[in-house]
Amino acid sequence: MKGVYFVSGIDTDIGKTVATGVLAKQLLQQGKSVITQKPVQTGCQNIADDIAVHRKIMGIPMQEADKRRLTMPEIFSYPASPHLAARLDGRALDLDKIRTATQELAAQYEVVLVEGAGGLMVPLTENLLTIDYIRQQGYPVILVTSGRLGSINHTLLSFAALKQYGIRLHSLVFNHIHDSRDAHIAQDSLSYLKCRLKADFSEAEWMELAKTDAV
């Protein structure tokens, strides 16, 4: 892996933050120079909570890029989608600021993992969806899914959106976080999605994230 990758999820609370941290940790262990970025963090004041989680999982302290806010260029106080959080905070989301920060990180690190807010269709502004931004920047996507009820539907909808927008899927990460809810559904979801990934995105990688991987 080399370059900038956008980490998205099929839904909220799918384990995207943990997955991003674990992937970064694995890349560090492989000798890669890697950093994570949360371009838009909502529900916070000063420090992006997700970046703090990434650093803890990676086993490293906050970096100079964190202190300079390159990894968390836009923070809004209200816990909502970016377009609403920005409106409630009374200021516009600065896309140029985000782009510049990501470019600076990409110049310093071999791999930049950009964790989005929610799923592909989350609005960044009133007129721009997350998937629009991904396409504009040309980022390949790492999509996080799980075995909870509804994941097959949400994953296939995400597949369809990526195809429609002409965005490359780098990998599908199956997070075992929800396996305990229903083992039958979890196992069937895993088997089904693994087959669909091979059929729909033959060049994409299949990854699995165990509950213990973040420890």
Curated annotation (Swiss-Prot):
The molecular function terms of the Gene Ontology recorded here are:
ATP binding; dethiobiotin synthase activity; magnesium ion binding
Q: Which cofactor does it need?
A: Mg(2+)
Q: Tell me which NCBIfam families the record gives.
A: bioD (TIGR00347)
- What stretch or stretches form a coiled coil here? none
What protein am I looking at?
ATP-dependent dethiobiotin synthetase BioD
What would be one Gene Ontology cellular-component term for the protein? cytosol
Q: Which residues form the active site?
A: 38
Say which family it is in: Belongs to the dethiobiotin synthetase family.
Where, in this chain's numbering, is Mg(2+) bound? 17, 50, 115
Q: In which pathway does it act?
A: Cofactor biosynthesis; biotin biosynthesis; biotin from 7,8-diaminononanoate: step 1/2
Q: Which Gene3D superfamilies match?
A: P-loop containing nucleotide triphosphate hydrolases
Enumerate the UniProt keywords alphabetically.
Answer: ATP-binding, Biotin biosynthesis, Cytoplasm, Ligase, Magnesium, Metal-binding, Nucleotide-binding
Q: List the signal peptide residues.
A: none
Q: Where does ATP bind?
A: 13-18, 50, 115-118, 175-176
Give the superkingdom in one word: Bacteria
By its UniProt entry, which InterPro entries does this protein fall under? DTB_synth_BioD, P-loop_NTPase
What do we know about how this protein assembles, alone or with others?
Homodimer.
Please name one Pfam family that this protein belongs to. AAA_26
Which compartment or compartments is the protein found in? Cytoplasm
Described by its record, this protein's role is as follows: Catalyzes a mechanistically unusual reaction, the ATP-dependent insertion of CO2 between the N7 and N8 nitrogen atoms of 7,8-diaminopelargonic acid (DAPA, also called 7,8-diammoniononanoate) to form a ureido ring.
SUPFAM superfamilies given in the database record: P-loop containing nucleoside triphosphate hydrolases
A GO biological process of this protein is: biotin biosynthetic process
User: Catalysed reaction per UniProt?
Assistant: (7R,8S)-7,8-diammoniononanoate + CO2 + ATP = (4R,5S)-dethiobiotin + ADP + phosphate + 3 H(+)
Residues that, per the record, bind substrate: 42
